[in-house]
Amino acid sequence: MPSVVPQERQQVTRKHYPNYKVIVLNDDFNTFQHVAACLMKYIPNMTSDRAWELTNQVHYEGQAIVWVGPQEQAELYHEQLLRAGLTMAPLEPE
């Protein structure tokens, strides 16, 4: 009688990629209007009210997380805000 050898099951583990934080830093040369306008221009679904809240947070707390999400999109928004003249922290995983 042939013996049956159970086959090992392979575990499939899904790797979750981290989200990245786009952080704007306070500086002495960008105006409130410029920061808020850049946030509305480059960050998807950014409302005027939210842009101004974040701009105030940048000013009074020194920084604000303006967007969190997948690395590729975070890199794009980070680069766009940087090119617009905003002072940016390096991207960091959440």
From Swiss-Prot:
Cited InterPro entries: ClpS, ClpS_core, Ribosomal_bL12_C/ClpS-like
GO BP field: protein catabolic process; proteolysis
A Pfam family per the record: ClpS
SUPFAM superfamilies noted in UniProt: ClpS-like
UniProt xrefs under NCBIfam families: PRK13019.1-3
Function: Involved in the modulation of the specificity of the ClpAP-mediated ATP-dependent protein degradation.
Subunit relationships: Binds to the N-terminal domain of the chaperone ClpA.
HAMAP family according to UniProt: ClpS (MF_00302)
Family to which the UniProt record says this protein belongs: Belongs to the ClpS family.
UniProt-recorded name of the protein: ATP-dependent Clp protease adapter protein ClpS
Organism: Thermosynechococcus vestitus (strain NIES-2133 / IAM M-273 / BP-1)
Gene responsible for this protein: clpS
